[in-house]
Protein backbone atom coordinates (compact mmCIF):
# COMPACT_ATOMS: atom_id res chain seq x y z
CA UNK A 1 0.00 0.00 0.00
CA UNK A 2 1.36 3.43 -0.91
CA UNK A 3 2.30 6.00 1.71
CA UNK A 4 -0.55 8.21 0.55
CA UNK A 5 -3.06 5.47 1.30
CA UNK A 6 -1.40 4.71 4.63
CA UNK A 7 -1.56 8.34 5.73
CA UNK A 8 -5.17 8.39 7.02
CA UNK A 9 -4.58 5.35 9.25
CA UNK A 10 -1.27 6.65 10.61
CA UNK A 11 -2.90 10.02 11.29
CA UNK A 12 -5.61 8.53 13.50
CA UNK A 13 -5.57 9.05 17.23
CA UNK A 14 -7.03 6.66 19.78
CA UNK A 15 -8.39 7.50 23.21
CA UNK A 16 -10.07 5.54 25.98
CA UNK A 17 -13.48 6.54 27.27
CA UNK A 18 -14.36 6.86 30.93
CA UNK A 19 -15.89 3.71 32.47
CA UNK A 20 -19.61 3.18 31.86
CA UNK A 21 -22.13 0.45 32.71
CA UNK A 22 -21.73 -2.57 30.44
CA UNK A 23 -24.81 -3.17 28.30
CA UNK A 24 -24.10 -6.90 27.89
CA UNK A 25 -22.97 -8.22 31.28
CA UNK A 26 -24.86 -7.11 34.38
CA UNK A 27 -22.87 -5.52 37.14
CA UNK A 28 -19.78 -4.85 35.05
CA UNK A 29 -18.18 -1.65 33.90
CA UNK A 30 -16.91 -1.16 30.36
CA UNK A 31 -14.60 1.18 28.48
CA UNK A 32 -14.08 1.73 24.76
CA UNK A 33 -11.12 2.74 22.64
CA UNK A 34 -12.27 5.31 20.09
CA UNK A 35 -10.61 6.10 16.76
CA UNK A 36 -10.55 9.77 15.75
CA UNK A 37 -10.93 12.02 13.83
CA UNK A 38 -13.99 10.54 12.15
CA UNK A 39 -13.48 12.34 8.84
CA UNK A 40 -10.27 10.35 8.21
CA UNK A 41 -12.02 7.00 8.59
CA UNK A 42 -12.94 6.23 4.99
CA UNK A 43 -13.95 2.84 3.61
CA UNK A 44 -10.37 1.61 3.22
CA UNK A 45 -9.30 2.69 6.71
CA UNK A 46 -12.47 1.32 8.25
CA UNK A 47 -11.92 -2.08 6.64
CA UNK A 48 -8.53 -2.25 8.32
CA UNK A 49 -9.96 -1.14 11.65
CA UNK A 50 -12.65 -3.82 11.52
CA UNK A 51 -9.95 -6.44 10.98
CA UNK A 52 -8.37 -5.07 14.16
CA UNK A 53 -11.58 -5.54 16.13
CA UNK A 54 -13.30 -2.18 15.75
CA UNK A 55 -17.00 -1.54 15.11
CA UNK A 56 -19.00 1.57 14.51
CA UNK A 57 -22.11 3.21 15.91
CA UNK A 58 -23.02 5.98 13.52
CA UNK A 59 -19.73 7.79 12.87
CA UNK A 60 -18.33 6.62 16.23
CA UNK A 61 -15.66 3.93 15.60
CA UNK A 62 -14.65 1.95 18.66
CA UNK A 63 -13.56 -1.35 20.17
CA UNK A 64 -13.82 -2.72 23.73
CA UNK A 65 -11.03 -1.50 25.99
CA UNK A 66 -12.10 -2.73 29.40
CA UNK A 67 -9.75 -2.77 32.38
CA UNK A 68 -10.43 -6.25 33.78
CA UNK A 69 -12.59 -7.98 31.19
CA UNK A 70 -11.95 -9.42 27.74
CA UNK A 71 -15.34 -11.01 27.15
CA UNK A 72 -16.09 -9.16 23.89
CA UNK A 73 -14.43 -11.20 21.15
CA UNK A 74 -14.58 -9.98 17.52
CA UNK A 75 -15.87 -12.73 15.23
CA UNK A 76 -16.40 -13.38 11.53
CA UNK A 77 -17.90 -16.17 9.44
CA UNK A 78 -15.85 -17.83 6.69
CA UNK A 79 -18.59 -17.68 4.10
CA UNK A 80 -17.04 -20.00 1.50
CA UNK A 81 -16.94 -22.82 4.03
CA UNK A 82 -20.25 -22.13 5.75
CA UNK A 83 -22.87 -24.89 5.80
CA UNK A 84 -26.18 -24.19 7.57
CA UNK A 85 -27.35 -26.58 10.25
CA UNK A 86 -30.85 -28.00 10.33
CA UNK A 87 -32.42 -25.17 12.33
CA UNK A 88 -30.79 -22.60 10.05
CA UNK A 89 -32.12 -24.38 6.99
CA UNK A 90 -35.60 -24.24 8.52
CA UNK A 91 -35.22 -20.51 9.14
CA UNK A 92 -34.13 -19.99 5.54
CA UNK A 93 -37.03 -22.00 4.14
CA UNK A 94 -39.50 -20.17 6.39
CA UNK A 95 -38.49 -16.69 5.28
CA UNK A 96 -36.86 -16.97 1.86
CA UNK A 97 -40.05 -15.64 0.27
CA UNK A 98 -39.34 -12.18 1.71
CA UNK A 99 -38.50 -9.51 -0.81
CA UNK A 100 -35.21 -7.73 -0.03
CA UNK A 101 -34.52 -4.19 -1.20
CA UNK A 102 -30.99 -2.78 -0.83
CA UNK A 103 -30.89 1.00 -0.57
CA UNK A 104 -28.70 3.87 0.69
CA UNK A 105 -29.05 4.86 4.35
CA UNK A 106 -32.30 6.81 4.26
CA UNK A 107 -34.84 7.82 6.89
CA UNK A 108 -38.22 6.13 6.44
CA UNK A 109 -40.95 6.72 9.01
CA UNK A 110 -42.11 3.12 8.71
CA UNK A 111 -38.60 1.89 9.58
CA UNK A 112 -38.45 4.15 12.63
CA UNK A 113 -41.84 2.91 13.86
CA UNK A 114 -40.71 -0.71 13.54
CA UNK A 115 -37.47 0.15 15.35
CA UNK A 116 -39.38 1.59 18.33
CA UNK A 117 -41.73 -1.41 18.42
CA UNK A 118 -38.79 -3.81 18.30
CA UNK A 119 -36.96 -1.99 21.10
CA UNK A 120 -40.06 -1.79 23.30
CA UNK A 121 -40.74 -5.52 23.04
CA UNK A 122 -37.23 -6.96 22.83
CA UNK A 123 -35.29 -4.50 24.99
CA UNK A 124 -37.91 -2.88 27.22
CA UNK A 125 -36.38 -0.61 29.83
CA UNK A 126 -33.08 -0.36 27.99
CA UNK A 127 -33.73 3.22 26.96
CA UNK A 128 -33.54 2.70 23.20
CA UNK A 129 -37.32 2.27 23.05
CA UNK A 130 -37.44 6.00 23.81
CA UNK A 131 -35.02 7.03 21.07
CA UNK A 132 -36.00 10.19 19.25
CA UNK A 133 -35.82 10.41 15.49
CA UNK A 134 -32.49 12.25 15.81
CA UNK A 135 -31.07 9.51 18.04
CA UNK A 136 -32.25 6.84 15.62
CA UNK A 137 -30.65 8.63 12.68
CA UNK A 138 -27.38 9.22 14.52
CA UNK A 139 -27.21 5.56 15.53
CA UNK A 140 -28.13 3.88 12.24
CA UNK A 141 -28.27 6.36 9.37
CA UNK A 142 -25.02 8.28 9.77
CA UNK A 143 -21.94 6.73 8.18
CA UNK A 144 -18.74 7.85 6.49
CA UNK A 145 -18.09 4.43 4.97
CA UNK A 146 -19.76 2.25 2.34
CA UNK A 147 -23.03 1.42 4.09
CA UNK A 148 -26.36 0.04 2.95
CA UNK A 149 -29.85 -0.40 4.34
CA UNK A 150 -31.78 -3.57 3.51
CA UNK A 151 -35.51 -3.85 4.05
CA UNK A 152 -37.42 -7.11 3.91
CA UNK A 153 -41.12 -7.15 3.04
CA UNK A 154 -43.81 -9.68 2.29
CA UNK A 155 -43.82 -10.10 -1.51
CA UNK A 156 -46.56 -9.09 -3.95
CA UNK A 157 -49.36 -11.63 -4.08
CA UNK A 158 -48.91 -12.75 -0.48
CA UNK A 159 -51.69 -12.29 2.12
CA UNK A 160 -49.92 -9.27 3.65
CA UNK A 161 -48.13 -7.99 0.56
CA UNK A 162 -45.77 -5.12 1.27
CA UNK A 163 -45.72 -5.55 5.04
CA UNK A 164 -42.36 -4.53 6.50
CA UNK A 165 -40.81 -7.41 8.41
CA UNK A 166 -37.18 -6.48 8.98
CA UNK A 167 -34.57 -3.76 8.42
CA UNK A 168 -30.83 -4.38 8.45
CA UNK A 169 -27.81 -2.10 8.15
CA UNK A 170 -24.58 -3.44 6.65
CA UNK A 171 -21.15 -2.04 5.80
CA UNK A 172 -19.25 -3.13 2.70
CA UNK A 173 -15.56 -3.78 3.47
CA UNK A 174 -12.70 -4.71 1.20
CA UNK A 175 -12.72 -8.27 2.55
CA UNK A 176 -16.37 -8.81 3.41
CA UNK A 177 -19.57 -7.40 4.82
CA UNK A 178 -20.04 -6.17 8.37
CA UNK A 179 -23.41 -6.63 10.02
CA UNK A 180 -24.13 -3.35 11.80
CA UNK A 181 -27.63 -3.68 13.27
CA UNK A 182 -30.91 -5.42 12.59
CA UNK A 183 -34.44 -4.93 13.89
CA UNK A 184 -37.57 -6.78 12.90
CA UNK A 185 -41.26 -7.40 13.53
CA UNK A 186 -41.42 -8.77 17.10
CA UNK A 187 -45.11 -9.63 16.90
CA UNK A 188 -44.91 -12.67 14.65
CA UNK A 189 -44.61 -15.85 16.64
CA UNK A 190 -42.31 -18.64 15.49
CA UNK A 191 -40.39 -16.30 13.20
CA UNK A 192 -36.61 -16.59 12.85
CA UNK A 193 -35.88 -13.22 11.29
CA UNK A 194 -32.54 -12.69 13.01
CA UNK A 195 -31.17 -16.04 11.87
CA UNK A 196 -32.55 -15.55 8.37
CA UNK A 197 -30.91 -12.13 8.16
CA UNK A 198 -27.46 -13.54 8.89
CA UNK A 199 -27.99 -16.33 6.36
CA UNK A 200 -29.01 -13.72 3.78
CA UNK A 201 -25.90 -11.68 4.54
CA UNK A 202 -23.70 -14.78 4.23
CA UNK A 203 -25.15 -15.42 0.76
CA UNK A 204 -24.67 -11.80 -0.25
CA UNK A 205 -21.07 -11.84 0.94
CA UNK A 206 -20.42 -14.99 -1.08
CA UNK A 207 -22.12 -13.51 -4.16
CA UNK A 208 -19.80 -10.50 -3.95
CA UNK A 209 -16.78 -12.80 -3.93
CA UNK A 210 -15.75 -11.66 -0.45
CA UNK A 211 -14.49 -14.09 2.21
CA UNK A 212 -15.85 -12.78 5.53
CA UNK A 213 -19.06 -11.73 7.23
CA UNK A 214 -18.19 -9.77 10.37
CA UNK A 215 -20.75 -10.25 13.15
CA UNK A 216 -19.37 -7.90 15.77
CA UNK A 217 -18.57 -9.33 19.19
CA UNK A 218 -19.18 -12.82 20.50
CA UNK A 219 -19.72 -12.89 24.27
CA UNK A 220 -19.99 -16.34 25.84
CA UNK A 221 -21.90 -15.17 28.93
CA UNK A 222 -24.35 -12.92 27.10
CA UNK A 223 -27.32 -14.81 25.72
CA UNK A 224 -28.11 -12.05 23.22
CA UNK A 225 -24.56 -12.22 21.79
CA UNK A 226 -23.58 -15.89 22.18
CA UNK A 227 -25.81 -16.96 19.25
CA UNK A 228 -23.04 -15.98 16.83
CA UNK A 229 -21.16 -19.19 17.63
CA UNK A 230 -23.89 -21.11 15.79
CA UNK A 231 -22.61 -19.88 12.42
CA UNK A 232 -19.62 -22.07 11.61
CA UNK A 233 -16.86 -21.98 10.63
CA UNK A 234 -16.33 -18.94 12.82
CA UNK A 235 -13.10 -17.09 13.42
CA UNK A 236 -12.35 -14.97 16.48
CA UNK A 237 -9.76 -12.25 17.02
CA UNK A 238 -7.47 -12.93 19.96
CA UNK A 239 -3.96 -11.64 20.52
CA UNK A 240 -4.14 -9.55 17.31
CA UNK A 241 -4.61 -12.70 15.21
CA UNK A 242 -7.69 -14.39 13.79
CA UNK A 243 -8.11 -17.98 14.99
CA UNK A 244 -10.69 -20.74 14.57
CA UNK A 245 -13.43 -20.45 17.19
CA UNK A 246 -12.65 -23.97 18.35
CA UNK A 247 -9.17 -22.81 19.40
CA UNK A 248 -10.76 -20.90 22.27
CA UNK A 249 -11.16 -24.23 24.05
CA UNK A 250 -13.96 -26.54 25.08
CA UNK A 251 -15.31 -24.34 27.88
CA UNK A 252 -15.80 -21.35 25.59
CA UNK A 253 -17.48 -23.47 22.92
CA UNK A 254 -19.82 -25.04 25.46
CA UNK A 255 -20.75 -21.63 26.82
CA UNK A 256 -22.25 -20.74 23.45
CA UNK A 257 -24.12 -23.99 23.01
CA UNK A 258 -27.56 -23.01 24.44
CA UNK A 259 -29.80 -21.55 21.76
CA UNK A 260 -30.43 -17.91 22.77
CA UNK A 261 -33.18 -15.51 21.73
CA UNK A 262 -33.18 -14.11 18.19
CA UNK A 263 -29.96 -12.27 17.27
CA UNK A 264 -29.05 -8.63 17.74
CA UNK A 265 -26.39 -7.18 15.43
UniProtKB/Swiss-Prot annotation:
Catalysis: reaction(s): N-terminal L-glutamyl-[protein] + L-leucyl-tRNA(Leu) = N-terminal L-leucyl-L-glutamyl-[protein] + tRNA(Leu) + H(+); N-terminal L-aspartyl-[protein] + L-leucyl-tRNA(Leu) = N-terminal L-leucyl-L-aspartyl-[protein] + tRNA(Leu) + H(+)
Coiled coil regions in record: none
GO molecular-function term, one example from the UniProt record: leucyl-tRNA--protein transferase activity
Places the protein is found: Cytoplasm
Major localisation: cytoplasm
Keyword Transferase on entry: yes
EC code: 2.3.2.29
The keyword Cytoplasm is annotated on this UniProt entry: yes
Broad class of enzyme this protein falls into: transferase
GO cellular component: cytoplasm
Keyword terms of this UniProt record: Acyltransferase, Cytoplasm, Transferase
Entry's Gene Ontology BP terms: ubiquitin-dependent protein catabolic process via the N-end rule pathway
PANTHER family per the UniProt record, alphabetical: ARGININE-TRNA-PROTEIN TRANSFERASE 1 (PTHR21367), ARGINYL-TRNA--PROTEIN TRANSFERASE 1 (PTHR21367:SF1)
Family affiliation: Belongs to the R-transferase family. Bpt subfamily.
Matches recorded under NCBIfam families: PRK01305.1-1 (NF002341), PRK01305.1-3 (NF002342), PRK01305.2-3 (NF002346)
Function: Functions in the N-end rule pathway of protein degradation where it conjugates Leu from its aminoacyl-tRNA to the N-termini of proteins containing an N-terminal aspartate or glutamate.
The protein, known as: Aspartate/glutamate leucyltransferase
Annotated organism of origin: Cupriavidus taiwanensis (strain DSM 17343 / BCRC 17206 / CCUG 44338 / CIP 107171 / LMG 19424 / R1)
Gene: bpt
